Amino acid sequence: MFKDISIKDFDPVLAKAMAAESVRQENHIELIASENYCSQAVMEAQGTDLTNKYAEGYPGKRYYGGCEHVDVVEQLAIDRAKELFGAEYVNVQPHSGSQANSAVFLALLEANDTVLGMSLDAGGHLTHGAHINFSGLNYNAVQYGLVEGTGLIDYDQVESLAKEHKPKMIIAGFSAYSQVVDWARFREIADEVGAYLLVDMAHVAGLIAGGVYPSPVPFADVVTTTTHKTLRGPRSGMILARDEKLAKKLNSAVFPGNQGGPLMHVIAAKAICFKEALENNFKTYQQQVVKNAQAMAKVIQERGYEIISGGTENHLMLISLVKQEMTGKEADKWLGDAHITVNKNAVPNDPKSPFVTSGIRIGTPAITTRGFNEAQAGALAGWICDVLDSRGDEAATAEVRSKVEAICKELPVYAKNQ
């Protein structure tokens, strides 16, 4: 029925845009902390005929026939995730990290219940209670922040707010925090007020799987994550728990509460991702991610730029540009012109709008996948500072761009593109 025809032949306009993106990924340095390069095997799984299969329900209990093979696929993903993170319960069906969080809210809370989460400008996420998100619109969201001067999580404030507001759920986790989180302290505070503890480990899931960042699974009631970022899998989500007492509620919240049919081709890609993460070389990769981040942070600080919290113990750093009287939007543009991709990001007490900001966030998962070592990461940090110091000067930008071009050729992402 279907002709054996390529995208290029059938839809050349789309093919051109896709090819251009492949070129961009090969020729630009990727420093967005939430991005990474997945393996060809992960991409292959997402292009299979599993995409045709509807499979509402869970393995062994589907609402459609013909699910005997996709049951095997999903169970493989579940079992591997359990082994990887030491969890008793895993749901691999959420389409994203945000939908995983949404399902947890649906499972554990009633409308207008109080939740306590990290504010966006302190490094939290939209789904941790931001007023423009479902978590802030449908629930009474209280926000905690950082200790002024150190940039570390203000655990005393978390405890004080918890005692004052008696939240039904406390959220730990972040999208732009570069230090180690004290999961045990969050557990103590949650127990003190009788709250559920949800940990969103999306950014550090790979580091945790690799044993270079402490796991929240023994402490949290529920853990959510994406499967890309440091985990280096497909763009998707997952829910885990230390025991199965909440399994029925969580499963029902994902399906039918929050989603219909799962994406079986993506779940297959998750199974591959988890198998890759169980390999010995994955730990070596995660160790290098942190080493590269620390090498970059050292140079950036030596060049006079402030890193919120004073450094990094994970894969990312949030750089304040307030002292330089520079906006994140400007820095994003100037570095982009040099073929270095970052994202503008709010900093604590940011006077600028979220679309402008006073900071940038950078991370090392993608460059480490590419093969960068500490020396190359440190050199890259210097190039970033050269561009920012020049405020986007054309000559300085061109010089850095030529260096970027050279190292991208030296360290290709995918050999097939060379």
UniProtKB/Swiss-Prot annotation:
One of its GO terms (biological process) is tetrahydrofolate interconversion. The modification N6-(pyridoxal phosphate)lysine is found at K229. SUPFAM superfamilies: PLP-dependent transferases (SSF53383). (6S)-5,6,7,8-tetrahydrofolate binds at L120, G124, H125, L126, S353, P354, F355. The keyword Amino-acid biosynthesis applies. It is an enzyme of class 2 (transferase). This is Serine hydroxymethyltransferase. It comes from Psychrobacter arcticus (strain DSM 17307 / VKM B-2377 / 273-4). The lineage of its organism: Bacteria, Pseudomonadati, Pseudomonadota, Gammaproteobacteria, Moraxellales. The gene is glyA.
